[in-house]
């Protein structure tokens, strides 16, 4: 098994990688990041180690080319590097799930994410009656919706079967329904879905289904939909790439993904007051995630937000590749 299957590596590089991996805590970190990006605080809480100790381990893994990092406001997220050697992944991911340390770490990660989902669910339930109005105070909703419809209608997008991931109050689903034959809205919050049901009942067009489910595990069949939309969803998620992976799974080969979300910004109050997990995204982040789960041909459409104090919004569009078949 070659550490570097696509190129010859210098001896010093191989030794650096082997030294970086040959430490239990660093193996635990690499294994945890299989589940998506984490902050230093996340890793400290799960492993039980101090921040200085974890920071030192992270630096070693970065220097070895095994991890990458990016900053969002005051938080720094760590993820597996795209060029991480396949042999390292095979060793780390090959550890038995029943191993005491691996299972304990996984349980703590699940518990932490469950706690956050519960807090977010309470937030969404509380704001559901005024959700659309609240969102319009920080994003240019009218411009976003108009541009979204232009993209869907003007391009060669098949839209017979549409799924709205994180449908919320059903606003976007109600806009897309007249353009489709079948439309499905997915959301994990029961209160939001109740409001969505009221919204879509007033809409003519496709046969509509609303389902309460995790956007990263919808339970929908493989290769079912022509178009998947994730409108202002990803910034609420701990692991946006998991939702994109699910979208790739349920889309037909050649199906279209449309992401509407905030561009990277620095407004920390959205974390503390509005349950945002991420302070927007760069196109480079979206492209990395899309490429990693089987999308191709990413394009971006930036929305004018010059009026007032609205945050910048972008619409990204990508297509599933044959890797998803």
For each of these PLM feature ranges, what is it?
Residues 2-9, 86-132:
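Amphipathic alpha-helical dimerization/coiled-coil segments
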Residues 9-52, 75-83, 147-149:
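N-terminal helix-turn-helix DNA-binding core of bacterial DNA-binding proteins
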Residues 63-72, 79:
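Beta-hairpin "wing" of winged helix-turn-helix
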Residues 139-160:
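Conserved alpha-helix/loop element of class I SAM-dependent methyltransferases that forms part
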Residues 161-163, 169-217:
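Class I SAM-dependent methyltransferase SAM/SAH-binding core
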Residues 216-228:
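A short acidic, Gly/Pro-enriched loop at the edge of an enzyme's catalytic core
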Residues 241-256:
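A short glycine-rich, Lys/Arg-flanked "PGG" loop and its adjoining helix->strand segment in the class I
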Residues 256-316:
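C-terminal alpha-helical "lid/dimerization" subdomain adjacent to the S-adenosyl-L-methionine
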